[in-house]
Amino acid sequence: MLDAIEGFILAGGESRRMGTDKSRLFLGGQTFGERIAGELSAVTSSIKVVGSNTAELKLPTNIQFTPDVYQRWGALGGVHAALSACSASWALVVACDFPFVTSELFRSLASVRESFEAVAPIQADGIPQPLCSLYRVEPCLRLADQLIKSGERKPIALLQSVRTRWVLFSELSKLEGADCFFDNINTPEDFARASRKGSEH
């Protein structure tokens, strides 16, 4: 288990392009939410699900649910809600549409957090991924609140406002399943591709 880290699954998206709640989609016999919760449970004993539409999620009874503080405020609102509900020093925040994340990925991110205020991976395409990242509750909660009150909706703005350790994909590429870590499942076509990969993972 990782010390001083609480895990959060963001399940509050509207899933308009998918047409159904992504956290309830099944892959390899488990919902996306169950898959992510299983990997998080290998590194932390405390897991919470953030979102306003979580009542029907099929997850272990020890997992708590917490609502958004700022309703309909997108991804930054979800990160803010996680930080608000976090009882540990760090929040490990994972979006529900990353079904191929692993506990080894989480351990790799956590291993470099010392002296930083956030840890965020860089995808293979060079784009930072704020929705599979570690946030130190102080100062990130305070800054997230300030950003939201200024009208900001993108969590990348939070990462750019604190001391962030950017983890290059080359630092993660040797981990098993690394090529799929950040496969974002947004559409039925994405889900079809993920289902094919799911039989391999």
Residues of each region from the PLM?
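Nucleotide and nucleotide-moiety/phosphate-recognizing core
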Residues: 2-152, 160-179, 192-199
